[in-house]
Every structure is written in structure tokens, then in C-alpha cells.
Amino acid sequence: MGQIQYSDKYFDDTFEYRHVVLPPEVAKLLPKNRILSESEWRAIGVQQSRGWVHYAIHRPEPHIMLFRRPLNYQQEHQAQIAK
């Protein structure tokens, strides 16, 4: 069985992004033409820290999942926990 591959993070002014490449045997578990919730992508084996959202489907290559989260998410999340 192939392994799930994670890209490095990349950024714009609002979000940090990463893409996740699924091996064929995992990709076939994806529902067609819809965004997955966090519980769904975790259930198929994608492992990431909190805050990531599956936000788009790359139609030419549906086995590549596109994720984003707001810049500074982790710092803001940790500050809320500390309160």
C-alpha cells in the first residue's frame, strides 16, 4: 500500500496551504465531487494538526486534496487555550 504524501506549506496574504497526495487505494475511497469534512479526511488516514480545511477539488487530479487554514492559526488557537 502506498503512503499519503504531504507537501510543504505555502502561503499568501491570508492563508497557509498544503496539498496531500493520496495513493490510489486511498483515493478510491473519496466521495466524488465534494469537499470532505475534517472527520471524513481523518477517517481515510490524512493526519494534520488542527485548523486545516479541505477547500477545493483539483479536477484533473482528484487524488490530490487541497487544504488551507488562516495564517497564524496555531498561535491564535494556543492563545485561546491559555485563557
Swiss-Prot record:
Keywords: Cell cycle, Cell division. One of its GO terms (molecular function) is cyclin-dependent protein serine/threonine kinase regulator activity. Pfam families: CKS (PF01111). One of its GO terms (cellular component) is nucleus. Gene3D superfamilies: Cyclin-dependent kinase, regulatory subunit. GO terms for biological process: cell division. PANTHER family: CYCLIN-DEPENDENT KINASES REGULATORY SUBUNIT/60S RIBOSOME SUBUNIT BIOGENESIS PROTEIN NIP7 (PTHR23415). Binds to the catalytic subunit of the cyclin dependent kinases and is essential for their biological function. Belongs to the CKS family. Interacts with CDKA-1, CYCD2-1 and AT4G14310. This is Cyclin-dependent kinases regulatory subunit 2. It comes from Arabidopsis thaliana (Mouse-ear cress).
